[in-house]
Amino acid sequence: MFGHALLLGAFPFCIGIYGLITSRNTVRALMCLELIFNAVNVNFVTFPNYLDIQQIKGEILSVFVIAVAAAEAAIGSAIVLAIYRNRESIRIDQFNLLKW
């Protein structure tokens, strides 16, 4: 049963990594990053349940990661919207605005 839970976390993680590497669209890259965060949360909840039942550190860490992911999504969406207003494009390879 432990292996099934790890596969449940590893499968979306691999999909998110693949999507993050191959995507040209910024919104798709942000969605893949959120998928990676959710896969990590599944593993954070899975490990404490099989190692020690008395501790809830995995669940607390998972809630913290959800809060950080929500802030990352809000800031990332705001940056994408600001760049879209200036450049009229959301393609990753055309984002050279933040280089200078």
Curated annotation (Swiss-Prot):
It catalyses: a plastoquinone + NADH + (n+1) H(+)(in) = a plastoquinol + NAD(+) + n H(+)(out); a plastoquinone + NADPH + (n+1) H(+)(in) = a plastoquinol + NADP(+) + n H(+)(out). GO terms for cellular component: chloroplast thylakoid membrane; NADH dehydrogenase complex. It is found in: Plastid, Chloroplast thylakoid membrane. GO terms for biological process: ATP synthesis coupled electron transport; photosynthesis, light reaction. It comes from the Eukaryota. Its EC number is 7.1.1.-. GO terms for molecular function: oxidoreductase activity, acting on NAD(P)H, quinone or similar compound as acceptor; quinone binding. It is a multi-pass membrane protein. Pfam families: Oxidored_q2. Keywords: Chloroplast, Membrane, NAD, NADP, Plastid, Plastoquinone, Quinone, Thylakoid, Translocase, Transmembrane, Transmembrane helix, Transport. It is an enzyme of class 7 (translocase). The chain crosses the membrane at residues 1-21, 29-49, 63-83. NDH shuttles electrons from NAD(P)H:plastoquinone, via FMN and iron-sulfur (Fe-S) centers, to quinones in the photosynthetic chain and possibly in a chloroplast respiratory chain. The immediate electron acceptor for the enzyme in this species is believed to be plastoquinone. Couples the redox reaction to proton translocation, and thus conserves the redox energy in a proton gradient. NDH is composed of at least 16 different subunits, 5 of which are encoded in the nucleus. Belongs to the complex I subunit 4L family. This is NAD(P)H-quinone oxidoreductase subunit 4L, chloroplastic.
